[in-house]
């Protein structure tokens, strides 16, 4: 009886195997296409296209920019060629894929499902859109007249260039950025694709990678009106102390000290614009020069008060007159030296 059950079970087992092979694409793909295409014939070529759909913000204090980035990757898998007569869709984990990773992403979210399209000739196409923050190493010495270099770098995780050859946009037409962007305080230049392998650690084999690169220039108008102009007005407020008669000691001291404290508070309020840096920016030099200039005015105000108290009013007025004339000349020189392009 048991022998007959075994005979009856064999046809059912064969039928199950046959149905498995004729199942939907995801089933068959998983069983036949998990090995790297052309593994014995050199590196597998993968075409990479990167499109920056939008840029929302550039943060100097965080050394990052917020953007929407679209990635398209295409490669040919001979194991999948000829299996279907029409385009098929499959899960990403059911086919071999180059394990693409955004190197400089910081807290991005994938917006599309992890799927691929398979053409009848074996062409596999993967699309994904990421939204979030990307790191950007910035040189802020010229802030806020600085130019920066931005990039989005993609690598093949676990594969060197000997195994996977990432080709940056062979046609040179599909990798670019959108013409209209949300960001308003930067002027961005054209993009270009380039090979950029990623070294995970010193001495380790570099991962195959490419990147989309573009440069940007900060628009000075916004900072000139909202930051620099108010600071100039604060400095000129300190100059008014020199237009008060040297005999009016308390009003002169009050204006000078108030200007000094306002400058210090203003500098702390604007500290969020840039990170803590081992060097001074143009803006730092400007605030430092302005603070020193107001401090010198404060010293001269104190000196003239000393001479007035000792009945040397003529000397105090002479000193005050020369300092009052020299102030705009020195301040103008500071402006020219620091803000010259």
Description of each model-found segment:
Residues 1-7, 17-20:
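Short, low-complexity, charge-dense intrinsically disordered segments
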Residues 6-10, 217:
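Short, Lys/Arg-rich cytosolic juxtamembrane segment immediately N-terminal
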Residues 9-14, 323, 327:
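Sec-dependent signal peptide hydrophobic core
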Residues 11-25:
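Bacterial N-terminal signal peptides
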Residues 29-215:
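Soluble non-transmembrane domains of integral membrane proteins
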Residues 29-79, 272, 279-341:
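Intrinsically disordered, low-complexity peripheral segments of secretory-pathway and membrane proteins
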Residues 163-165, 190, 268-269, 336-341:
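C-terminal ends of transmembrane alpha-helices
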Residues 211-330:
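Channel- or pocket-lining gating/hinge segments that regulate access to a cavity or pore
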